[in-house]
């Protein structure tokens, strides 16, 4: 079974080689990404119990949920630069162990202030993880195969949403009161420890770069290095940016930064508040809330894979991304419109999540065709750093609106408008983000 479609490659030899690499690294990175997303958004479920225990208002929760991204943004670029210096294996392992410890420590939150501090520190600890993973894939897979690789990883968001909702609801409902701990405290403990354990595994399992890895033959190592070096030269000759100064002057890159910002506003604005949105649709147990919260992520995951495969097969990025963002915009607007009609609201949330997740994995395949060398890592980190400000702004905005008006749907309309702007910007991006030549076609 191929993780990356046969139609993506020029030859059966390339297909076999790069799928062998994909099977080696993608399933493991997928697990890491699932754990990362669970640790990032489980606070949305914890709120259903901890708000009363800790004294969190809707605005305080929104601020605390979003302040994670301030820490994340401040340390994003330094973290990615350190990864290039010390190597992916050591740095990703460090990230996971530290964030797992801090995530577990969330069980000791007792006041809004301690909630803010630990959420900020969690962002600092996790800074560099996703752009580091994206950068790591550029070391192993050619650009024309990266969208499907990113789709496999981004599927971790959907999978985490599918299992995270029911799991979180079950933990909070089942363990509440056990050994004197509240259900939300057990949630942070049981979902934080896996990151620490996996961080240790990372150090022994991942290899920094191709060239001398034991699970490839000498000829295969040499071919991967040659393919990726040739691709780098082709991008440089075609005008891909190499220097840091040029990266910051690249207009298309700043367009991608804005698009990523808008997408993250929508995704995290919904993800952090999804349990509350679902809860408002009718009376449910915590487990039922978790099960219903899983539905949009399940639908989004399927759509993301289909769009990612089609984008790689046609080697087109811009329109796949812009139309997906437009679908997210429509879903957000409809979910606000039908907030009193459970089935229609849930269907609209499915459309919003399908559009967001589909756009993400296509969007993140573009920077590698615009940038090369040191500019690649910094460009990716720039997209994530500025984009993740949306992860701070949207949960706080949703909390402020909820506390001021008593309605979350006004916030959903604002997120829909922002996604509409992003779809229009993405449609105007002119770069190599359209069709890209396959590695191996060059003489």
Which sequence ranges carry the predicted segments?
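Cytoplasmic membrane-interface "Motif A"-like loop-to-helix N-cap segments
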Residues: 84-96, 312-325
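C-terminal transmembrane helical hairpin of 12-TM major facilitator-type secondary transporters
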Residues: 317-366
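Cytoplasmic helix-loop-helix junction between adjacent transmembrane helices
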Residues: 118-155
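Glycine-rich segments within core transmembrane alpha-helices of 12-TM secondary carriers
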Residues: 150-172, 194-195, 384-394
């Amino acid at each position: 079974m191929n993780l990356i479609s046969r139609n993506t490659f020029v030859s059966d030899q390339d297909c076999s080689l790069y799928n062998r690499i994909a099977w080696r690294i993608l399933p493991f990175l997928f697990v890491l990404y699932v754990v990362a997303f669970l640790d990032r958004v489980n606070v949305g479920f914890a709120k259903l119990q901890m708000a009363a225990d800790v004294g969190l208002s809707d605005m305080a929760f929104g601020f605390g949920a979003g302040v994670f991204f301030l820490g994340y943004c401040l340390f994003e670029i330094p973290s990615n630069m350190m990864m290039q210096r010390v190597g992916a294996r050591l740095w990703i392992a460090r990230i996971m162990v530290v964030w797992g410890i801090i995530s577990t420590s969330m069980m000791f939150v007792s006041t809004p202030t301690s909630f803010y501090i630990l959420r900020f520190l969690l962002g600092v600890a996790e800074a560099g993880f996703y752009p580091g993973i994206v950068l790591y894939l550029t070391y192993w897979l050619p650009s024309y195969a990266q969208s499907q690789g990113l789709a496999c990883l981004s599927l971790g968001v959907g999978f985490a949403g599918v299992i995270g909702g029911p799991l979180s609801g079950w933990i909070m409902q089942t363990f509440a009161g056990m050994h004197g701990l509240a259900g939300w405290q057990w949630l942070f403990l049981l979902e934080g420890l896996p990151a620490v354990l996996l961080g240790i595994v990372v150090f022994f399992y991942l290899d920094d770069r191709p060239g001398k890895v034991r699970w490839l033959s000498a000829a295969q190592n040499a071919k991967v290095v040659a393919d990726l070096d040739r691709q780098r030269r082709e991008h440089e000759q075609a005008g891909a940016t190499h220097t840091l100064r040029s990266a910051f002057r690249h207009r298309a890159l700043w367009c991608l930064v804005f698009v990523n910002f808008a997408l993250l506003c929508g995704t995290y604005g919904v993800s952090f508040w999804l349990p509350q949105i679902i809860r408002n649709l009718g009376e449910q147990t915590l487990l039922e809330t978790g099960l219903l919260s899983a539905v949009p992520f399940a639908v989004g995951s399927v759509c993301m894979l289909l769009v990612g495969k089609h984008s790689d097969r046609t080697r087109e990025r811009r329109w796949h991304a812009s139309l997906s963002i437009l679908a997210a915009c429509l879903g957000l607007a409809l979910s606000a419109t039908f907030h009193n009609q459970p089935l229609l609201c849930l269907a609209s949330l499915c459309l919003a999540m399908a559009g967001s997740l589909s756009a993400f994995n296509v969007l993140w395949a573009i920077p590698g065709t615009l940038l090369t060398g040191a500019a690649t890592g910094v460009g990716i980190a720039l997209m994530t750093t500025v984009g993740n400000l949306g992860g701070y702004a949207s949960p706080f905005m949703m909390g402020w609106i909820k506390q001021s008006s008593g309605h979350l749907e006004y916030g959903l309309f604002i997120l829909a408008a922002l996604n509409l702007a992003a779809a229009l910007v993405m449609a105007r991006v002119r770069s190599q983000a359209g069709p890209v030549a396959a590695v191996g076609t060059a003489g």
